[in-house]
From Swiss-Prot:
Species name: Bacillus subtilis (strain 168)
One Pfam family, short name: SelR
UniProt entry keywords in alphabetical sequence: Oxidoreductase
Annotated PANTHER family: METHIONINE SULFOXIDE REDUCTASE, PEPTIDE METHIONINE SULFOXIDE REDUCTASE MSRA_MSRB
Reaction it catalyzes: L-methionyl-[protein] + [thioredoxin]-disulfide + H2O = L-methionyl-(R)-S-oxide-[protein] + [thioredoxin]-dithiol
E.C. no: 1.8.4.12
Segments forming domain MsrB: 5-126
The protein's name in its UniProt record: Peptide methionine sulfoxide reductase MsrB
């Protein structure tokens, strides 16, 4: 899936730009996907690259969408020492978008919680994966 990063960045709304380009954080419980339950794929709002699946989403009660793991190598982790804290930042590899942070207080075997800003994501419903060019990810929902 080809994209023009500069053009896509120009089309972002204020919150999407602040989060993805300026490492911002949207307000908890006041964002699009924190309690979203539909089956599908969460992709990078800038590049369109798949990041997370609804199968790995869980209710962490933190006010942001939370996932136990990314679906492929598109997610990078970097040390973040901003705001007087030591955290692990999560960024998209292709667009270098700030997505959120990963913490070691999650459920499941890996114990991770990927706390992601909704503004960094676009949701593609399972029934539209083929239509939008994500057909190769349909197998993730058959497990």
């Amino acid at each position: 899936m080809a994209y023009n990063k500069e053009e896509k960045i120009k089309s972002l709304n204020r919150m999407q730009y602040e989060v993805t380009q300026n490492n911002g954080t949207e307000p908890p419980f006041q964002n699009e996907y924190w309690d979203h339950k539909e089956e599908g794929l969460y992709v990078d709002i800038v590049s369109g690259k798949p990041l997370f699946t609804s199968k790995d989403k869980f209710d962490s009660q933190c006010g942001w969408p939370s996932f136990t793991k990314p679906i492929e190598e598109e997610v990078e982790e970097k040390l973040d020492t901003s705001h007087g804290m030591i955290r692990t930042e999560v960024r998209s590899r292709t667009a270098d978008s700030h997505l959120g942070h990963v913490f070691n207080d999650g459920p499941g075997p890996n114990g991770l919680r990927y706390c992601i800003n909704s503004a960094a994501l676009r949701f593609v419903p399972k029934h539209k994966l083929k239509e939008e060019g994500y057909e190769s990810y349909l197998h993730l929902f058959n497990k």
